[in-house]
Amino acid sequence: MNVLGIESTAHTFGVGIVSDDDSEIRILSNERDTFVPKQGGMKPSDLGRHHSEVAPEVLQKALIKANLSIRDINYIAVSLGPGIGPALRVGATIARALSLKYDIKLVPVNHGIAHIEIGRFTTRSKDPLILYLSGGNTIITTYLDGKYRIFGETLDIALGNMLDTFVREVGLAPPYIVNGVHQIDLCANKGGNFIELPYIVKGQDMSYSGLLTAALRATKNNRLEDVCYSVREVAFDMLLEATERALALTGKKEILVVGGVAASVSLKTKLYNLAKDWNVEVKIVPPEYSGDNGAMIAFTGLLEARHGVTIPVEKSIIRPRWRVDQVDVTWRLSEN
């Protein structure tokens, strides 16, 4: 079985191909092109335009890398949400067109679930507490009775969005990432004087909007490097407090970190220290799969296809607010 996955929920258009020939799952290709604004944030219309322009080349590269033609594909998996409308529509439209033209079955994939499943696959995690951390999501979740249950999440903006917005507003970005390191870390590593900023954890939920506002205000009277350091420390410590509470509640022995923020070296260090205190193991998705990518969509699509989860083209409607706890995780029922 060959599954082609299409990712287009936000700034990245990606195509990945996964095969399970001989009962071994292999990632054959994982091509992508990411939109980087020249200034300011991401405009939905710009994302849609970018994805439409790069899609043919990214698709062709993925097929060539996998040494396959489109007629070798058995299923097309597409991320239908959550995400940004104009971006989602490009991926969905391409998936529908390929499905109709080549008579290939369509598989609907939740973007967040795909981050989780590629993380479980690449790290060999069994039953972890999951930290899903990205530009659009900050979620603490774990699997129970056919669904991923959310134990904690942001009450407003996501951790990744908060960090990106801060470095952009103070003139450090774009680019947001330099040689694999986020601008907040590059700046924070030059600081060290802690500035008191809002620390808001309610149960296992976090709030980052107040931290962002206060941090931007603090740059007027403090060294930028010290503000960066303080923002990073407060933001990650809030997450760790919520994580500890979730560990106490669930009793899990593994922590799996997925999503773009998983690449942060500072966060990894804090989590490894937490793991020692709680006698748990921390597993972090490899960098090539931490950001948005097509391979994670293809892989999750393969899991779904194995269990007969397909949809007709007319029902492949994008769902910009599709939560991970709304998905029936049928493929995990057979694991228990």
UniProtKB/Swiss-Prot annotation:
Its cofactor is Fe(2+). Disulfide bonds: none annotated. Its main location: cytoplasm. Keywords: Acyltransferase, Cytoplasm, Iron, Metal-binding, Transferase, tRNA processing. One of its GO terms (cellular component) is EKC/KEOPS complex. CDD domains: ASKHA_NBD_Kae1_arch_bac. Gene3D superfamilies: 3.30.420.40. Pfam families: TsaD. Fe cation binds at residues 111, 115, 132, 292. It catalyses: L-threonylcarbamoyladenylate + adenosine(37) in tRNA = N(6)-L-threonylcarbamoyladenosine(37) in tRNA + AMP + H(+). GO terms for molecular function: iron ion binding; N(6)-L-threonylcarbamoyladenine synthase activity. It comes from the Archaea. It is found in: Cytoplasm. Its EC number is 2.3.1.234. Coiled coil: none annotated. One of its GO terms (biological process) is tRNA threonylcarbamoyladenosine modification. It is an enzyme of class 2 (transferase). Binds 1 Fe(2+) ion per subunit. Belongs to the KAE1 / TsaD family. Required for the formation of a threonylcarbamoyl group on adenosine at position 37 (t(6)A37) in tRNAs that read codons beginning with adenine. Is probably involved in the transfer of the threonylcarbamoyl moiety of threonylcarbamoyl-AMP (TC-AMP) to the N6 group of A37. This is tRNA N6-adenosine threonylcarbamoyltransferase. The lineage of its organism: Archaea, Thermoproteota, Thermoprotei, Sulfolobales, Sulfolobaceae. The gene is kae1.
